[in-house]
Amino acid sequence: FFEYARKRLEKIKSTVSYSTYRAYTSQIDKFEKYMGTKDVYFDEITVALLNDYKFHLGDTLGNGDTTQRLSIIVLGTIFRDAIREEVIPETMFPFSKITLKISSSKRLFLNKVQIDALANLKLIEGKKAMMWRDLFLFSIYAGGLRFSDVIEMQYSNYNEAEHKINKHIRKTGRVHQFKIGKVAIDILEKYKK
């Protein structure tokens, strides 16, 4: 299992975001640590083993429902890929018998006072902290653009005449075009070369 999983991760490395690759890798590492060996065959990963692992995630590691769900889903994805590539038969897929809790997550957002405090925070000119703050603020003021999309943005994505960004959004795979406000424009102008 682990040999296949590592090879599969290397194959998809260039087709997924870095954060997805890291998440998958860390979940495989965590499962390998739980198993205590790299020599695990697909048929050894049973419903009982997965339920024990799920209990270990929650009870021993203190992982919440969302993290437990991610851990099991990553393993299931590796199984599905192995089935698709005819490495194992469909009958070996134990995940359909596993129950995963879905808990509603509370997403926390900064309020206007917190955003203003961050924007007005005195930082040393020319240091990386200032650039990271500007990137974060740009993500807020550019219509909530995901930080990962901000990082890979290029100046060519910006239409200066119309104050619009035309960007391929990594998560959805779609191209979005949207107008940005003065704060975002000022940040772009600050770094224009």
Predicted regions: what they are:
Residues 1-61:
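Basic/aromatic-enriched alpha-helical hairpins
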Residues 20, 24-27, 46, 67, ...:
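Hydrophobic (often cysteine-bearing) scaffold residues that line and stabilize catalytic clefts
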Residues 30, 34, 40-48, 59-94, ...:
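N-terminal DNA-binding recognition helix of tyrosine site-specific recombinases/integrases
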Residues 53, 78-79, 191:
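Conserved hydrophobic/aromatic "anchor" residues
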Residues 55-64, 165-170:
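Glycine- and acidic
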Residues 56-59, 84, 117-124, 156, ...:
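Conserved helix-loop functional segments at active or binding sites
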Residues 65, 69, 90-147, 151:
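Basic, Lys/Arg- and aromatic-enriched nucleic-acid-binding interface segment
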Residues 96-97, 152-192:
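Conserved tyrosine-mediated DNA breakage-rejoining catalytic core shared by Y-recombinases
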